[in-house]
């Protein structure tokens, strides 16, 4: 692939890691953020120590606070900002951009109040004459591993296969590999909803439960993620892939996962306010829990794990009581996404 110019909106852990992948592939990378001290650190010291204490970035990765300068003559834009500000940043991009580009996003969540997927938000806010079909970049990927060039395999999903293939070529190299998919709904819902299950899996660990329980929450969590996704129009097969069960495993079993760590702290009795203050990063699973719970209620989809986590986070239900309420639910058969 010829050298491309890519704007990465969001200098967090994942935005930084993906910037390095793109730079390794010979592309011009411009990171945009709104914290001058962080942008200055990236440009002066080539570090982003809030997220990666021991990583030195290539000096060709340049960071900006000026959005117009960031977007000038770019070929593609990658959104990697928190879910709650995606719409605002998209509006700013729409007001600034003056040519058509490939639009990608690598964030995982649902908009808190509207329950909308992020590709829907980008489609609503960025006019068609300025963008391609949206491409979702998602899958089992800890930034802490990608930044040190550990093997990572994820998915590029778009309604337009050729656009997904462009993104596949843009990112893929000897340590980072993308597969294409056209099921945008499935890939996005899998990426968003697995954060909820990761909170639950972490809570089980914090409470001292063993591997049996942790395996069960991943398997049954995948079942209810699939139920909601299918109700929204996704293919059930997507949830057996990298962006589905793959992402759920990596997020629901690892200390690298901020959602897992948040659940672990909840299980050990810490308050949600203290957890959010100590984490120093956005915990998407918290806001996504409310959005998914309300969406499931609206669509009549059975999601007992999500409901239990919602009750714990937003209504102060005792975690162990919530767990044993699930254990005492009506007996059911198990099938494809029962």
UniProtKB/Swiss-Prot annotation:
<dbReference type="InterPro" id="IPR013328">
    <property type="entry name" value="6PGD_dom2"/>
</dbReference>
<dbReference type="InterPro" id="IPR006168">
    <property type="entry name" value="G3P_DH_NAD-dep"/>
</dbReference>
<comment type="similarity">
    <text>Belongs to the NAD-dependent glycerol-3-phosphate dehydrogenase family.</text>
</comment>
<dbReference type="GO" id="GO:0046168">
    <property type="term" value="P:glycerol-3-phosphate catabolic process"/>
</dbReference>
<feature type="binding site">
    <location>
        <position position="108"/>
    </location>
    <ligand>
        <name>NADPH</name>
    </ligand>
</feature>
<feature type="binding site">
    <location>
        <position position="194"/>
    </location>
    <ligand>
        <name>sn-glycerol 3-phosphate</name>
    </ligand>
</feature>
<keyword id="KW-0594">Phospholipid biosynthesis</keyword>
<feature type="binding site">
    <location>
        <position position="259"/>
    </location>
    <ligand>
        <name>sn-glycerol 3-phosphate</name>
    </ligand>
</feature>
<feature type="binding site">
    <location>
        <position position="139"/>
    </location>
    <ligand>
        <name>sn-glycerol 3-phosphate</name>
    </ligand>
</feature>
<feature type="active site" description="Proton acceptor">
    <location>
        <position position="194"/>
    </location>
</feature>
<keyword id="KW-1208">Phospholipid metabolism</keyword>
<feature type="binding site">
    <location>
        <position position="258"/>
    </location>
    <ligand>
        <name>NADPH</name>
    </ligand>
</feature>
<dbReference type="InterPro" id="IPR036291">
    <property type="entry name" value="NAD(P)-bd_dom_sf"/>
</dbReference>
<keyword id="KW-0560">Oxidoreductase</keyword>
<comment type="function">
    <text>Catalyzes the reduction of the glycolytic intermediate dihydroxyacetone phosphate (DHAP) to sn-glycerol 3-phosphate (G3P), the key precursor for phospholipid synthesis.</text>
</comment>
<feature type="binding site">
    <location>
        <position position="258"/>
    </location>
    <ligand>
        <name>sn-glycerol 3-phosphate</name>
    </ligand>
</feature>
<dbReference type="Pfam" id="PF07479">
    <property type="entry name" value="NAD_Gly3P_dh_C"/>
</dbReference>
<keyword id="KW-0963">Cytoplasm</keyword>
<dbReference type="GO" id="GO:0046167">
    <property type="term" value="P:glycerol-3-phosphate biosynthetic process"/>
</dbReference>
<feature type="binding site">
    <location>
        <position position="282"/>
    </location>
    <ligand>
        <name>NADPH</name>
    </ligand>
</feature>
<feature type="binding site">
    <location>
        <position position="14"/>
    </location>
    <ligand>
        <name>NADPH</name>
    </ligand>
</feature>
<protein>
    <recommendedName>
        <fullName>Glycerol-3-phosphate dehydrogenase [NAD(P)+]</fullName>
        <ecNumber>1.1.1.94</ecNumber>
    </recommendedName>
</protein>
<keyword id="KW-0520">NAD</keyword>
<keyword id="KW-0547">Nucleotide-binding</keyword>
<dbReference type="InterPro" id="IPR008927">
    <property type="entry name" value="6-PGluconate_DH-like_C_sf"/>
</dbReference>
<comment type="pathway">
    <text>Membrane lipid metabolism; glycerophospholipid metabolism.</text>
</comment>
<dbReference type="GO" id="GO:0008654">
    <property type="term" value="P:phospholipid biosynthetic process"/>
</dbReference>
<dbReference type="Pfam" id="PF01210">
    <property type="entry name" value="NAD_Gly3P_dh_N"/>
</dbReference>
<feature type="binding site">
    <location>
        <position position="13"/>
    </location>
    <ligand>
        <name>NADPH</name>
    </ligand>
</feature>
<dbReference type="GO" id="GO:0051287">
    <property type="term" value="F:NAD binding"/>
</dbReference>
<feature type="binding site">
    <location>
        <position position="247"/>
    </location>
    <ligand>
        <name>sn-glycerol 3-phosphate</name>
    </ligand>
</feature>
<feature type="binding site">
    <location>
        <position position="284"/>
    </location>
    <ligand>
        <name>NADPH</name>
    </ligand>
</feature>
<dbReference type="GO" id="GO:0005975">
    <property type="term" value="P:carbohydrate metabolic process"/>
</dbReference>
<feature type="binding site">
    <location>
        <position position="257"/>
    </location>
    <ligand>
        <name>sn-glycerol 3-phosphate</name>
    </ligand>
</feature>
<dbReference type="GO" id="GO:0006650">
    <property type="term" value="P:glycerophospholipid metabolic process"/>
</dbReference>
<feature type="binding site">
    <location>
        <position position="141"/>
    </location>
    <ligand>
        <name>sn-glycerol 3-phosphate</name>
    </ligand>
</feature>
<keyword id="KW-0521">NADP</keyword>
<dbReference type="InterPro" id="IPR006109">
    <property type="entry name" value="G3P_DH_NAD-dep_C"/>
</dbReference>
<feature type="binding site">
    <location>
        <position position="108"/>
    </location>
    <ligand>
        <name>sn-glycerol 3-phosphate</name>
    </ligand>
</feature>
<dbReference type="GO" id="GO:0005829">
    <property type="term" value="C:cytosol"/>
</dbReference>
<keyword id="KW-0444">Lipid biosynthesis</keyword>
<dbReference type="InterPro" id="IPR011128">
    <property type="entry name" value="G3P_DH_NAD-dep_N"/>
</dbReference>
């Amino acid at each position: 692939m010829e050298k491309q110019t890519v704007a990465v909106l969001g200098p967090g852990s994942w935005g930084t890691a993906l910037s390095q992948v793109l730079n390794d592939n010979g592309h011009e990378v411009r990171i945009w953020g709104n914290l001058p001290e962080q942008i200055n650190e990236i440009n002066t010291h080539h570090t982003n120590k809030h997220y990666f204490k021991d990583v030195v970035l290539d000096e060709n990765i340049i960071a900006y606070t000026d959005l117009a300068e960031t977007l000038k003559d770019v070929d593609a834009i990658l959104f990697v900002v928190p879910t709650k500000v995606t719409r605002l940043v998209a509006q700013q991009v729409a007001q600034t951009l003056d040519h058509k580009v490939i639009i990608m996003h690598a964030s995982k969540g649902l908009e808190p109040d509207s329950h909308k997927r992020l590709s829907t938000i980008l489609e609503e806010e960025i006019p068609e004459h300025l963008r391609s079909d949206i491409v979702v970049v998602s899958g089992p990927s800890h930034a802490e591993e990608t930044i040190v060039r550990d093997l990572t395999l994820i998915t590029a999903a778009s309604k337009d296969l050729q656009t997904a293939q462009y993104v596949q070529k843009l990112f893929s190299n000897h340590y980072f590999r993308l597969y294409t998919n056209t099921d945008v709904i499935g890939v996005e819902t899998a990426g968003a909803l697995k954060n909820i299950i990761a909170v639950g899996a972490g809570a089980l660990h914090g409470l001292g439960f063993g591997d049996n329980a942790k395996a069960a929450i991943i398997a049954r969590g995948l079942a209810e993620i699939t139920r909601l996704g299918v109700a929204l129009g996704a293919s059930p097969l997507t949830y057996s892939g990298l962006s589905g069960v793959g992402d759920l495993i990596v997020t629901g079993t690892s200390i690298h996962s901020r959602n897992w760590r948040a659940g672990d702290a909840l299980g050990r009795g810490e308050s949600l306010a203290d957890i959010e203050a100590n984490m120093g990063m956005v915990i998407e699973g918290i806001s996504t829990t409310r959005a998914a719970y309300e969406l499931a209620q609206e669509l009549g989809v059975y999601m007992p794990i999500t409901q239990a986590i919602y009750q714990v986070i937003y209504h102060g239900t005792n975690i162990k009581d919530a767990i044993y309420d699930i254990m005492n639910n009506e007996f059911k058969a198990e099938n494809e996404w029962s």
